[in-house]
């Protein structure tokens, strides 16, 4: 009988925001507007950087890569979420769920390390301005971007393999897309080893880049404190303010959603953090 149950699970259904069924239309409109603004904003950033030759610098190159990565990242999540408001029981195949998880994890980790690369770029621009152009050559920039993406691919392969080799007995995913932990909960067997593997991966992809960014800003601050002119302070603040804001929001939400014990997080909180 158990074998029969294992072979029957070929697709999943998302629980999504079914708890808020009375507000489906409102949520659909709100998230559609936010999604449109996000995609449009990233498209504008990439277009301006591409057209304006004055912006063909390492800092804006990394920014354009982050914008493109975030755009593709949302394509794997938000349309699925929006469709769940319209068709509440829309299923996804096991293969489709695997594919969605792989690309979601790849791009999420890629974003983490791209932010780290941007922190390194700011460090070099402020702390080593004379050597900045030499060290951050076009070749080095491409290698850093490829390195971030490669780490994302490798970590995604580990996580997806550890999850989708499990036998599944349940079909309702407690999320609006195929995230690692909600899918793992559908397994029929003990997943302790898989949970340990994925927790170690999460620690690596969140704490390591966050730590590197922290070190970069400690070095930046120590350099800025030596600057006597107000103009130098303004230039440094203008360079780092946007990146630091994104870093705080990104790593803050990621840490709460993926590092805190699940007993301390409500389902609604996890859903909203995932959207962020």
From Swiss-Prot:
The keyword Glycoprotein applies. InterPro entries: GPCR_Rhodpsn, GPCR_Rhodpsn_7TM, Olfact_rcpt. It holds the Pfam family 7tm_4. It is a multi-pass membrane protein. Gene3D superfamilies: Rhodopsin 7-helix transmembrane proteins. GO terms for molecular function: G protein-coupled receptor activity; olfactory receptor activity. The keyword Transmembrane applies. GO terms for cellular component: plasma membrane. Disulfide bonds join 97-188. Residues 47-54, 121-139, 217-236 are cytoplasmic. It comes from the Eukaryota. GO terms for biological process: detection of chemical stimulus involved in sensory perception of smell. Keywords: Cell membrane, Disulfide bond, G-protein coupled receptor, Glycoprotein, Membrane, Olfaction, Receptor, Sensory transduction, Transducer, Transmembrane, Transmembrane helix. It is found in: Cell membrane. Residues 1-25, 76-99, 161-196, 258-270 are extracellular. Glycans are attached at residues 5, 190. Belongs to the G-protein coupled receptor 1 family. Odorant receptor. This is Putative olfactory receptor 10J6. The lineage of its organism: Eukaryota, Metazoa, Chordata, Craniata, Vertebrata. The gene is OR10J6P.
